[in-house]
């Protein structure tokens, strides 16, 4: 099997990242609506696993977003993000190695966490090194046990993925010590039970 970053580098060359953007948009907009609606002051933002940077570009157009940063481990994704947005902040780094110069108010991650063999370790790293006090982490995953349609993805894509149940994902957030944990299934339809969204805040 190949590493996830190798797969994503190949996908950029085939423009598959554009399809990912299209399919991820509804759930990401739901996640952002939930995260941003309570905010009444300026905030800072990181997209953990930013791909071609489309969420960062969107956030940079939000009047209250003072800083938006995209971090990704796939060089071709970061290169494309920089081509599409020459003034944006896009950083090539393994998420486990990255520590922002300043902690931020909101970290979003869509379809990323299950590519890590130890998602709880990544969550704790983000909690400790990325998020300010009262800051929020919100993630979305389509690869989880209750979604029967995803069970062959790892074999079909050719990269390792961590299969966890909905309860497992929620337990990771609880064990991390994050507060105000919420979870729901976003944007279900006749063929898909929905993106599993989990969120929590730093005390």
Model-derived regions, located:
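Conserved class I S-adenosyl-L-methionine
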Residues: 1-38, 145
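A conserved beta-strand element that flanks and buttresses the S-adenosyl-L-methionine
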Residues: 108
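Short, glycine-/aromatic-enriched active-site segment of Class I SAM-dependent methyltransferases
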Residues: 142-160
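Short alpha-helix
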Residues: 161-176
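Class I SAM-dependent methyltransferase SAM/SAH-binding core
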Residues: 46-48, 52-97
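Conserved S-adenosyl-L-methionine
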Residues: 178-189
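Conserved beta-strand signature within the Rossmann-like core of class I S-adenosyl-L-methionine
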Residues: 134-142
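A short glycine-rich, Lys/Arg-flanked "PGG" loop and its adjoining helix->strand segment in the class I
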Residues: 120-134
């Amino acid at each position: 099997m190949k590493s996830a970053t190798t797969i994503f580098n190949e996908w950029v060359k085939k423009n598959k990242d554009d399809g990912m953007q299209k399919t991820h948009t509804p759930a990401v907009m739901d996640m952002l609506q939930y995260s941003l609606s309570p905010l009444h002051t300026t905030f800072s933002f990181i997209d953990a696993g930013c791909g071609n940077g489309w969420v960062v570009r969107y956030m940079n157009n939000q009047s209250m977003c003072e800083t938006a940063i995209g971090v990704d481990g796939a060089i071709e994704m970061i290169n494309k993000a920089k081509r599409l947005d020459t003034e944006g902040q896009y950083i090539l780094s393994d998420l486990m190695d990255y520590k922002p110069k300043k902690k931020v108010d909101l970290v979003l991650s869509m379809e990323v966490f299950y590519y890590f063999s130890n998602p709880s370790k990544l969550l704790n790293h983000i909690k400790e090194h990325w998020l300010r006090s009262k800051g929020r982490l919100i993630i979305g995953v389509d690869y989880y046990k209750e979604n029967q349609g995803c069970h062959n993805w790892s074999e079909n894509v050719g990269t390792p993925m961590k299969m966890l149940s909905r309860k497992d994902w929620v337990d990771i957030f609880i064990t991390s010590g994050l507060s105000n944990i919420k979870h729901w299934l976003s944007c279900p339809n006749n063929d898909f039970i929905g993106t599993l969204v989990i969120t929590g805040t730093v005390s």
